């Protein structure tokens, strides 16, 4: 590899040397005798950050291992809440976690950057130079040696190469994209209110491609927030007449990966909210001002959101000769080790993990599976340090919950009374839905900080607009 002969630092500086093209981030001087085990985690999503936090608390704090988290973003945000950022019903500044501060509080190292290469023989990860918003280089290309590598880079939406998708549709993969959609939505309403002429038919129409959990939750959330937005003085707009939401799904029902009863309940509620649901409708092209279906029908839209399909990042398919599947996920064993390297693990959406007990099935890419895998990885790494056998991970499916804005939450809990599925909705379902995020917060911050932050949010919420206006 081109970087194999990069100079090796021996002065203990963890940030590398900007005077060379590629530097090695070294946590100990040359010679491995008695050196601490080096754990490198790539990706600071739900699973990656929970793992780094827990390993830092258990190993880094006691100086039993060096724990490093590599992530290109500066702050962490729980991805299942992105639809609320897009709708404007949640302020990201209140809910995001700063990686640098988190690493300081929990005894791991955060290094900003994006992984671009892997040398399995030398056990080194290469991270590209980090460039800021102004195009200025902040850090050079660097290399990070590891003894245990955990890939937790998450997933992206999959546009399946659909023409126009990248150019004209907004995908909700990051908080920045969700905020971009929200700004465009607010601007569209202000523009419509201020224009001299009457609103054009379907001027404020939003097309959401993909009726999985993200698409369905976004549609329900937008129904409420757009009406709240109009109530703030944009009275030329009639939300019932001028604003339309269209949900487009290629499968024969919405929420196709979830139980039919949940899909039926969500369909009925969306109908009450005047959301137009188009199933068995495949998108052939995204246009500057709408969507063309495979049937030839054109659906006009001022804004198009792509929320269909899931794949792991493209760089994984050529990464160090590791085995991947057709959507770029790293294929792993029940121990969460990759099939071709026992020192490399993968968790979360980027891992194709067998579902033990379900022949031929894979664990679905959900927040609950990433949370469970992070907890299991803590045990696996501690076993590695003790030279003990690794245990297979068994996924526990606790069910599915879908939030339909302020109107309802519907879902099913697995293993209910008598070992059967338990259908839930209403207030109890909403409490269960909120508890999913609270579990993530507790894993990152602990009980007292979560309790105080929650109380502060409740107080602040009473003095702020219910919809973000910028």
Feature annotation, model-predicted:
Residues 67, 366-385, 401:
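An active-site-proximal "capping" alpha-helix that borders the catalytic cofactor pocket
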Residues 15, 64, 106, 110-129, ...:
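A Rossmann-like FAD-binding core segment of flavoenzymes
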Residues 21-27, 167-196, 289-292, 298-303, ...:
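FAD-site-proximal beta/loop scaffold in flavoenzymes
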Residues 47, 154-157, 219, 310-312, ...:
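Short glycine-rich anion-binding loops that position phosphate/pyrophosphate groups of nucleotides
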């Amino acid at each position: 590899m081109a970087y194999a002969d990069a100079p090796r630092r021996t002065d203990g500086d963890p940030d590398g040397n900007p005077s060379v093209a590629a530097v090695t981030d070294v946590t100990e001087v040359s010679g491995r005798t008695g050196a601490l085990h080096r754990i490198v985690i790539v990706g600071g999503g739900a699973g990656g950050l929970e793992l780094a936090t827990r390993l830092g608390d258990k190993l880094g704090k006691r100086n039993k291992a060096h724990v490093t988290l590599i992530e290109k973003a500066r702050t962490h945000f729980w991805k299942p809440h992105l639809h609320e950022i897009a709708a404007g019903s949640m302020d990201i500044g209140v809910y995001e976690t700063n990686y640098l501060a988190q690493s300081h509080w929990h005894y791991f190292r955060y290094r900003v950057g994006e992984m671009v290469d892997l040398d399995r023989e030398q056990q080194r990860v290469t991270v590209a130079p980090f460039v800021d918003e102004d195009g200025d280089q902040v850090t050079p290309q660097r290399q990070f040696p590891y003894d245990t590598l955990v890939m937790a880079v998450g997933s992206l939406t999959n546009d399946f190469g659909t023409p126009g998708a990248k150019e004209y549709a907004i995908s909700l993969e990051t908080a920045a994209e969700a905020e971009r959609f929200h700004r465009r939505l607010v601007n569209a309403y202000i523009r419509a209110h201020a224009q001299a002429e009457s609103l054009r038919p379907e001027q404020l129409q939003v097309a959401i491609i993909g009726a999985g959990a993200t698409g369905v939750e976004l549609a329900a959330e937008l129904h409420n927030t757009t009406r709240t937005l109009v109530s703030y003085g944009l009275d030329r707009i009639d939300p019932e007449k001028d604003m339309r939401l269209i949900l487009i799904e290629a499968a024969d029902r919405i929420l196709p990966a979830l139980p039919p009863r949940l899909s039926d309940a969500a369909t009925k509620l969306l109908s009450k909210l005047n959301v137009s649901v188009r199933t068995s409708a495949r998108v052939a092209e995204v246009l500057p001002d709408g969507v063309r279906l495979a049937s030839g029908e054109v659906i006009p839209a001022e804004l198009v959101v792509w929320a269909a399909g899931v794949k792991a990042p493209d760089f994984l398919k050529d990464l160090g000769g590791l085995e991947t599947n057709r959507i770029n996920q790293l294929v792993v064993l029940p121990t969460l080790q990759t099939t071709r390297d026992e020192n490399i693990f993968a968790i979360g959406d980027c891992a194709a993990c067998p579902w033990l007990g379900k022949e031929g099935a894979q664990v679905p890419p959900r927040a609950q599976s990433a949370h469970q895998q992070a907890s299991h990885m803590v045990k696996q790494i501690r076993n590695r340090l003790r030279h003990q056998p690794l245990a297979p991970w068994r996924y526990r499916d606790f069910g599915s919950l879908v939030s339909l804005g302020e109107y309802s939450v519907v879902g099913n809990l697995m293993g209910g009374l008598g070992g059967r599925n338990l259908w839930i909705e209403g207030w109890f379902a909403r409490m269960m839905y909120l508890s999913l995020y609270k579990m993530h917060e507790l894993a990152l911050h602990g009980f007292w900080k979560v309790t105080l932050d929650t109380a502060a949010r409740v107080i602040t919420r009473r003095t702020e607009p219910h919809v973000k206006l910028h």
